[in-house]
């Protein structure tokens, strides 16, 4: 299970204060230590994304999905060009990530009343992700069911 990583701390105040989404995405990549051999990732968001190996991209996107506050900001603010870049080389991995989000069931203790709310929130968020990226999927791809 991927651990949530909060990069929206005081050192990243620009994220909350309307920094442009390309810089935010670059910051997200920069802060993911698991995939950050610092000499390989450039400052340019597009080339940084393209430098990620497939397994690194999957890991990054799963992490991004688990950083809901960050992802919500980035998804809302990404330019169409940035979304297309995200999808161009990584359709299968993003599909896997969306499927994982839809099927995600957080571990709850028996009788935990928040499970239904959590599942509902996951579904709403998954739908938001799908609506954002669906136009870049191959024709005929079906939306995952909750």
Curated annotation (Swiss-Prot):
Name of protein: Uncharacterized protein YcgY
Name of the gene this protein is made from: ycgY
Highest taxon, organism lineage: Bacteria
């Amino acid at each position: 299970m991927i651990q949530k990583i909060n990069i929206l701390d005081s050192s990243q105040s620009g994220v909350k204060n309307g920094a442009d989404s390309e810089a935010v995405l670059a910051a997200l990549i920069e802060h993911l230590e698991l995939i950050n051999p610092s000499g390989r990732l450039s400052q340019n968001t597009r080339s940084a994304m393209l430098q990620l190996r497939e397994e690194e991209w999957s890991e990054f996107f799963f992490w991004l999905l688990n950083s809901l506050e960050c992802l919500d900001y980035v998804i809302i603010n990404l330019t169409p060009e940035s979304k297309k870049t995200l999808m161009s080389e990584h359709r299968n991995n993003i599909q896997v990530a969306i499927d994982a989000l839809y099927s995600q069931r957080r571990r709850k203790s028996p009788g935990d009343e928040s499970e239904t709310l959590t599942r509902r929130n996951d579904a709403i968020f998954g739908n938001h992700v799908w609506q954002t990226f669906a136009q870049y999927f191959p024709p005929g791809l079906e939306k995952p069911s909750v």
